[in-house]
UniProtKB/Swiss-Prot annotation:
It comes from the Bacteria. The keyword Cell inner membrane applies. Na(+)/H(+) antiporter that extrudes sodium in exchange for external protons. This is Na(+)/H(+) antiporter NhaA. It is found in: Cell inner membrane. It comes from Syntrophobacter fumaroxidans (strain DSM 10017 / MPOB). HAMAP family: NhaA.
Length: 472
């Protein structure tokens, strides 16, 4: 139905708009387009987040070990106060980023989880079984390795640190090697990392909590109930969810449960169904295209939306219908994703990665039990857990390898699973109050992530040639 207008000799709506854009484009606009287009293309690349995070990490380590290192580290301890009226909240910049801004990170993680569970790789047990089993092994074995090195004392609380995989770094490396690996491997690692994130969220909720305030928990439960009512009632506007999400964060902040979990809980209440079905949108699109052609053919046609209200109405209706065919979950994920990738996570790295190698005594620090436990857990624990649990799942018939993926590919992914970084750094802040133990954990995370990335890249580069599909 939508193609009939093209067959009848009418120019498609997209071609008309592109032609008018080229006609009306000024020379300066074209110049800015040539300058900004490469930058915009970079921001849209899958690897961009990992590249920015890597650059931020290097700059943070340089700053922390420079002549201004002490001032740089003290900067994050400054106190800030914000609120409305008598409702005031005071915290350090460090806590504002870790407890506040990182809630947006967990919100995006929750949105990704819900999407994958609804329509993605985790939507059916047959597809989800292998990455879920692999993620389980990649959490259990590293925790056991760490606990074997640190079975007693305060250091034992860090067992959750090596359980997480950083999806930005790991998937970014696979994308760089995409010409040497089957496409199914990237999908497998993405599903594994998302299942891994779910496990990390559960660990934080169940084991890294402070003294529980039942009153605050009760208030948070009431807010969560209201969010669920909004979802069931078909409310798709973002503002009510945003307001209640802030109240949920404040309640959890005073409850003893880590406040960033508000992001995950909020994400699971965001509607996943669009207001307008695709078939209805297609019909509306054809109607708008016909209306646009009729307007363009009118004798009094004015090629300027500011002085042509009918043309402006068509454009506004098209924009409104385009929003309606997207679910609130999609819109929120697309809007928040770049902010989290390029603002929140780099700020988190600036705030948490800084290590003064002189104070920690680098060589001695590498031999500390916490550093060794984290490093061994991430590098060898992740590799062993992911590979062994995957083998068990396939042997028992519970899961299956993705199309064209062979065991040599999966072993490369198992090495990349040792890139912990963001979530591991976050858990280390919850596990230890002692600054020295936090520094040792950071050193272990950075060392393990670097080793895992190097081993995984080398393994997949030399052993990751694409498998030929089996003949029928």
């Amino acid at each position: 139905m939508g193609r009939s207008s093209a067959r009848d000799g009418q120019m498609p709506l997209r071609d008309i708009m592109d032609k008018k854009k080229r006609k009306n484009e000024y020379a300066l606009e074209r110049l800015f387009g040539r300058i900004l287009s490469p930058f915009e293309a970079f921001l849209k690349r899958t690897t961009a987040g990992g590249i920015v995070l890597m650059g931020t990490t290097v700059l943070t380590l340089i700053a922390a070990n420079s002549a201004w290192g002490d001032a740089f580290l003290r900067f994050w301890e400054q106190r800030v106060r914000f609120g409305i009226g008598s409702l005031q909240l005071e915290m350090s910049l460090h806590d504002l980023i870790n407890d506040g801004l990182m809630s947006l990170f967990f919100l995006v993680v929750g949105l990704e989880l819900k999407r994958e569970m609804k329509v993605g790789e985790l939507s059916s047990w047959r597809d989800a079984a292998l990455p879920v089993f692999a993620a389980a092994g990649g959490m259990v074995v590293p925790a056991l390795v760490y606990f074997a090195v640190n079975p007693h004392g305060t250091a034992a609380a860090g067992w959750g640190i090596p359980m997480a995989t950083d999806i930005a770094f790991a998937v970014g490396i696979l994308v760089l090697l995409s010409w040497r690996i089957p496409p199914g491997l990237i999908i497998f690692l993405t599903a594994l990392a998302i299942a891994d994130d779910l496990g990390a969220v559960l660990v934080i909720a169940l084991f890294y909590t402070h003294e529980i305030s039942l009153g605050a928990i009760g208030f948070a439960s009431a807010v969560l109930f209201l969010l669920l009512l909004l979802n069931r009632g078909g409310i798709r506007h973002a503002i009510p969810y945003g307001v209640l999400g802030v109240l949920l964060w404040m309640a959890l902040h005073h409850s003893g449960v880590h406040s960033t979990l508000a992001g995950v809980l909020l994400a699971f209440t965001i509607p996943a169904r669009p207001a307008r079905a695709p078939a209805e949108f297609e019909q509306r699109l054809v109607e708008l295209q016909n209306a646009f052609h009729a307007e363009a053919a009118a004798p009094d046609f004015v090629d300027q939306p500011l002085s042509n209200p009918r043309m402006a109405t068509i454009a506004e209706t098209l924009e409104r219908n385009s929003r309606a065919v997207q679910s609130p979950l999609q819109r929120m994920e697309h809007r928040l994703g770049p902010w989290v990738t390029f603002i929140v996570i780099p700020l988190f790295a600036l705030n948490n990665v800084g290590i003064d190698f002189e104070k920690i005594a680098l060589l001695q620090g590498l031999c500390e039990p916490v550093t060794m436990g984290v490093c061994l857990g991430l590098v060898f624990g992740k590799f062993t857990g992911i590979s062994v649990f995957s083998w068990i799942a396939v042997r028992l018939g519970i899961g299956r390898l993705p199309s064209e993926v062979r065991w040599r590919h999966l072993l490369g992914v198992a090495w990349l699973g040792g890139i912990g970084f963001t979530m591991s750094l976050f858990i280390s802040q919850l596990a230890f109050d002692d600054r020295l133990l936090q520094e040792q954990a950071k050193l272990g995370i950075l060392t393990a992530s670097l080793l895992s990335a190097m081993i995984g890249m080398t393994w997949l580069y030399f052993g990751g040639t694409r498998a030929r599909p089996n003949p029928e």
